C-alpha cells in the first residue's frame, strides 16, 4: 500500500514537471546573443582501467557493472549527444561547461574528442581529487571565448564554526571531492568559475557536510571579490541540496531575487524555478534541483555596456534566469520511472541511458 502511494505521488509530480518542461522547452528555443555557462553531472563517466588507490572496481570489465569498452564508448557518445543537442538548440556551444562524476582527465579527453562536439575545441581544467571512488569535477571551456589565468583545486576542510556530526577521528578519514576554481577573462572582464560536487545525501545525514562545502566556496569567492573588485563569479555544481536548503541560502548566501542581494551575496536563478515546481533530477520520489548555478552581484546586475545575466524564459511578468535542458531522448519513456532522466543503469541493469541529472545553464550577454 505504501509503495503504491509513493508511486502515485511520483507520477503526479512527473506529470506536473513534464508540463513545466514543455513550457520551458517551447519558450526557450531562441536565446539572445551572449555566452552560455552551464553544468552537467555526467553520472559516473568512468573508463575501463583501474586508477591506483581508487575504489573504481565496479566500473571495470570484470566488475559488478561489467563495464566494457563498448559500454564506455556508448556513454561517451551519449554525453556528447546531449552537449551537441544543447548547442543545436542554442545556436552555439557552451563557453563554460562544468562537469561532475568524471573519473579522470582521460575520460574528459575522450569526451571532447567525440565527433558530435569535436568542432567546439573544448579545453580541459581538471585535478585528481581525494574522493575514494575517484570521481572528480572538471571544467570544459572554449579557448576562443575564455582565457584561463589561474586554476586551483580547493580542498575540503573542517576548519569551521559548524558543529559536525562526525567525530574528529571520522573527520580525519573523511574524503570527498575538492572544489575547482578557474579564473580567467571573457572579453575584457575577469571571471571566476567554481565547480562543486558537494557530499552526498545519506538519509537525513550530511547537511552539515554540504553546508561546509558551500561555506568553503563562499569564503574563497569573497576573497576573490575583495582581491579583484568587479570580478564576476559563478558557483555551479551538483550541490546534493535544493536551492532553498541551508547550504545554499545561509552558507552560500543564495538570494531569490536580485533586489535582495547585498554586495557579497549570490543570486540563485534556480530558487524561484524550484519553488515553481521545476526539477533537474528525481530523488526519493520528489523532483529536486541539485544542479545549481549562482552568480555574484557583479554578474547578476552588471553595468551598462558590460556582460550580465540574461533572462532565458519570460512568463507574463516573471522571468527565469536559469534553464534545465530536457529532451525526450534523455527521458525514461516507460516503466515505473517514466518521465524521469534516462540513466545509464536502472535497478542494476545496463539500460544505456544518459544521466540521472538534466544539465542546467545560464546566459550572459550585454542587451
Features from the language model and the residues they span:
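Bacterial Sec-dependent N-terminal signal peptides
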Residues: 1-32
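N-terminal, active-site-proximal structural segment of metallo-dependent hydrolase catalytic domains
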Residues: 27-115, 121, 125-137, 320-323, ...
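Metal-dependent phosphoester-hydrolase catalytic domains
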Residues: 29, 222-233, 241-367
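Beta-strand-turn-beta hairpins that frame and shape the catalytic cleft
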Residues: 30-37, 46, 145-147, 174-200, ...
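Metal-dependent phosphoester/phosphodiester hydrolase catalytic core
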Residues: 53, 186-219
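Structured beta-strand-rich core segments of catalytic domains in phosphoester-bond hydrolases
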Residues: 102-190
Amino acid at each position: 500500500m505504501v509503495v503504491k502511494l509513493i508511486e502515485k505521488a511520483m507520477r503526479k509530480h512527473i506529470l506536473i514537471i513534464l508540463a513545466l518542461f514543455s513550457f520551458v522547452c517551447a519558450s526557450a528555443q531562441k536565446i539572445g546573443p551572449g555566452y552560455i555557462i552551464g553544468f552537467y553531472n555526467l553520472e559516473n563517466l568512468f573508463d575501463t582501467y583501474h586508477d591506483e588507490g581508487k575504489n573504481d572496481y565496479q566500473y571495470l570489465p570484470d566488475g559488478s557493472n561489467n563495464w566494457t569498452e563498448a559500454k564506455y564508448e556508448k556513454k561517451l557518445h551519449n554525453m556528447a549527444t546531449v552537449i551537441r543537442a544543447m548547442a543545436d538548440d542554442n545556436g552555439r556551444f557552451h563557453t563554460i561547461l562544468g562537469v561532475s562524476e568524471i573519473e579522470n582527465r582521460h575520460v574528459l579527453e575522450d569526451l571532447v574528442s567525440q565527433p558530435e562536439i569535436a568542432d567546439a575545441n573544448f579545453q580541459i581544467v581538471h585535478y585528481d581529487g581525494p574522493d575514494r571512488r575517484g570521481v572528480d569535477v572538471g571544467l570544459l571551456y572554449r579557448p576562443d571565448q575564455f582565457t584561463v589565468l589561474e586554476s586551483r583545486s580547493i580542498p575540503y576542510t573542517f576548519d569551521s564554526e559548524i558543529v559536525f556530526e562526525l567525530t574528529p577521528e571520522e573527520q580525519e578519514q573523511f574524503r570527498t571531492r575538492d572544489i575547482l576554481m578557474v579564473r580567467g577573462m571573457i572579453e575584457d572582464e575577469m571571471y571566476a568559475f567554481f565547480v562543486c560536487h558537494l557530499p552526498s545525501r545519506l538519509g537525513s545525514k550530511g547537511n552539515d557536510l554540504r553546508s561546509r562545502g558551500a561555506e568553503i566556496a563562499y569564503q574563497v569567492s569573497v576573497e576573490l571579490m575583495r582581491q579583484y573588485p568587479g570580478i564576476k563569479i559563478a558557483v555551479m555544481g551538483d550541490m546534493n541540496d535544493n536551492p532553498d536548503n541551508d547550504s545554499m541560502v545561509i552558507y552560500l548566501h543564495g538570494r531569490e531575487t536580485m533586489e535582495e542581494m547585498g554586495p557579497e551575496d549570490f543570486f540563485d536563478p534556480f530558487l524561484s524555478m524550484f519553488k515553481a515546481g521545476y526539477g533537474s533530477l528525481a530523488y526519493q520520489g520528489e523532483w529536486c534541483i541539485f544542479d545549481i548555478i549562482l552568480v555574484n552581484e557583479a554578474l547578476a546586475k552588471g553595468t551598462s555596456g558590460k556582460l550580465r545575466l540574461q533572462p532565458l524564459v519570460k512568463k507574463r511578468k516573471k522571468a527565469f534566469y536559469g534553464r534545465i535542458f530536457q529532451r525526450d531522448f534523455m527521458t525514461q519513456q516507460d516503466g515505473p520511472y517514466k518521465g524521469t532522466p534516462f540513466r545509464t543503469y536502472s535497478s542494476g541493469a545496463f539500460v544505456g541511458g544518459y544521466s540521472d541529472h538534466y544539465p542546467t545553464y545560464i546566459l550572459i550577454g550585454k542587451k
